[in-house]
From Swiss-Prot:
Belongs to the MurB family. Coiled coil: none annotated. Pathway: Cell wall biogenesis; peptidoglycan biosynthesis. It comes from Nitrosomonas europaea (strain ATCC 19718 / CIP 103999 / KCTC 2705 / NBRC 14298). This is UDP-N-acetylenolpyruvoylglucosamine reductase.
């Protein structure tokens, strides 16, 4: 099947005006933490928010757009992705203390800021409430998009407002009241005039309580130590693969089914944490997805519970994207 080349895709824009980096046929295994998957037809790293808006305004409306951060919660199928993948972590990484007083402080973090960096930044300014973010391997944009959380805390517990950008390159400021937020789920409240389905987070303001620098830093260190002991950080993975079902833990159910160490090719259910699937060498996305399917079917057959994936699975099966 013929696919548009880079020149035809960008025919509506003078690429000399773009200040970011635009590439074609980009291997996505370079950009996802599983280190597996196919190619992106086009790949763009914007220079800043203004450059991103310019790119989106002129990108063909019938061509898909996928936004990523560190790619830590993402599986790109081996057939790759049509359209364009836009990465935010390299440039949309502003991090600043907006205000601070006796009642706490307000921090702004761009979508590309790693969650652990935000946790450390808050601790260094004697603010508490963001320590749990040190346990999340992705970026602020991804954490906002899925209401990432751990140890009983969730991202949107701390959000005061956010900025977003849509397919037309329009940047808006929004509040939590504009969203339906739940466990690992965030959805923009729709109105009759909401005709743009693609809206992405570009940053957020986080309201935190006053704390003590050393106690917050110690909490971050404790959490990171726990991650090292309980998670297979020595292998490429995407973090927790499945959401925890109500009243239970996905890892316990998977282990109960005897699936720790279960392997297909170079993809394996971690022997350290059963809710992790690791790449032991040169795993393909299809091998990883086959394990996901096997785990879901085994747990459902044994318990009646159908595990829901926490990771996003996108792209085309097999083949390659030109």
């Amino acid at each position: 099947m013929d696919t548009p080349d880079l020149q035809s895709r960008t025919s509506g824009i003078d690429t000399r005006l773009l200040r970011g980096e635009l590439r074609q046929h980009e291997p996505m295994k370079r950009h996802v933490s599983w280190r597996a998957g196919g190619h992106a037809a086009c790949f763009y790293q914007p220079a800043d928010l203004e450059d991103l808006a310019l790119f989106l305004r002129h990108w063909p409306k019938d061509e898909p757009v996928v936004m990523i951060g560190l790619g830590s919660n993402l599986l790109v199928r081996d057939g790759g992705l049509p359209g364009v993948v836009i990465t935010l972590h390299a440039k949309l990484n502003d991090l600043s203390l907006v205000e601070q007083n006796e009642s706490g402080g307000l921090i702004y973090a761009g979508a590309g800021v790693p969650c652990a960096k935000l946790a450390r930044f808050a601790a260094s300014h004697n603010l508490t409430g963001a320590e749990f973010l040190a346990g999340i391997p992705g970026t602020v944009g991804g954490a906002l998009a899925m209401n990432a959380g751990c140890y009983g805390a969730e991202t949107w517990d701390r959000v005061e407002r956010v900025t977003t950008i849509d397919r037309s390159g329009i940047v808006r400021e929004r509040t939590p009241e504009d969203y339906q937020v739940g466990y690992r789920h965030v959805e923009l409240q729709r109105t009759p005039s909401s005709d743009t389905p693609d809206v992405w987070f570009t940053g957020g303001w986080f309201r935190l309580r006053p704390g003590k620098m050393e106690s917050s830093r110690q909490a971050v260190r404790t959490l990171l130590t726990a991650r090292i002991k309980t998670q297979p950080l020595g292998f490429p993975s995407a973090g927790s693969v499945f959401r925890n079902p109500p009243g239970d833990h996905a890892a316990r159910l998977i282990e109960q089914c005897g699936l720790k160490g279960f392997r297909i090719g170079d993809a394996m259910v971690s022997t350290l944490h059963a809710n992790f699937i690791v790449n032991c060498g040169h795993a393909t996305a299809s091998e990883i997805e086959a394990i996901i399917d096997t785990v879901q079917n085994a747990v459902h057959q044994a318990t009646g519970i159908r595990l829901i994936t926490e990771v996003r699975i996108i792209g085309q099966l097999g083949g390659s994207t030109q």
